[in-house]
Amino acid sequence: MKKYYDAVIVGCGVAGCFAALHLPQEADILMITKADTEDSDSFLAQGGICVLKNESDYDAFYEDTMHAGHYENTPESVDIMIRSSRNVINQLIAWGVDFRRDENGELCYTKEGAHSTNRILFHDDVTGKEITSKLLAQVKKLPNVTLLAHTEMCDILSGKNGCEGVLIRDEEGKLVPVYARDVIWACGGIGGIYDNSTNFPHIAGDGLGIAMKHQVVLEHLDYIQIHPTTLYSSKPGRRFLISESVRGEGAVLLNEKGERFTDELQPRDVVAAAIFNEMEKENSNHVWLSLAPIDEAVIQNHFPNIYEHCLEEGYDVTKEPIPVVPAQHYFMGG
């Protein structure tokens, strides 16, 4: 490892990899990650990625996004996200990402909460793993990128020009200052500070702590997304996500009486609040998710990861409902 790079990227999930792949190939880049390269939140994402299918869907897509964000979204950012989505998908496909296609080779679209139509591309129920692994493979081909696992950012190096690099702890535990013209943080998760989260435990908001120390302006630190459906367990550790696309394909939420109590495809904060309310009314530590409306072949074909994990936990989702509970999922401030 050298003492100076053109750019240091902290994190190697989708954001970090995408940054590395778009920087000039003559730039000397160091990427670091706190654990294994595959242990990013991006790797854990299940459901899929939304895309503008055609121009006629723009207005609905825009309104769905603004509504889900309680109209606090920056309109220009929403427009950029939607307008650029097809180009991003095309880039991902060019890098080898394999989205589900039908028998005619056309891309398949599923539905998730807060979307008024099917506009979600997916790879079974391990879309994050598919995207991140393919991006990582592309990054590892770049001769100008040095990727170091088990290497932790402990602080930034500040000087007269602002941020001038990072102080890292290497795999041997040594503190090493590394200087760079540009420092890119792609390490936004905070789930490790929660008892119940879908995130890896080591993802604990390190960047936020360092930002606060150096009086970096932060905003919306209370914008913490609670995912409505994780598999209930009394065991400690990371919570297993039950993808929203399961509800998009027809699964329903039930209370202890076997009654539906909410519209399952509302925005996540609304559905999570409805579940918490039902749990409080029934003095229960979970509600139930029934996949009975979904054909068994669809479950095993579209959701093989969820199907197998639930079997390991003693639940056959093709024959019985499963206990689910909300847990921390995304962090949208910073």
Regions found by a protein language model. Give the residues of each.
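Flavin (primarily FAD) binding-site architecture
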Residues: 185-198
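Conserved redox-cofactor binding core of oxidoreductases
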Residues: 93-174, 179, 186-187, 230-233
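N-terminal Rossmann-like FAD-binding beta1-loop-alpha1 element of flavoenzymes
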Residues: 7-31
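Short beta-strand to alpha-helix junction loop
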Residues: 75-86, 119-137, 148, 198-205, ...
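An anion/pyrophosphate-binding glycine-rich loop and adjacent beta-alpha core
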Residues: 37, 210, 216-330
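Glycine-rich active-site loop/strand segments that organize a redox cofactor
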Residues: 50-81
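Residue-level detector of alpha-helix initiation sites
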Residues: 9, 13-14, 36, 126, ...
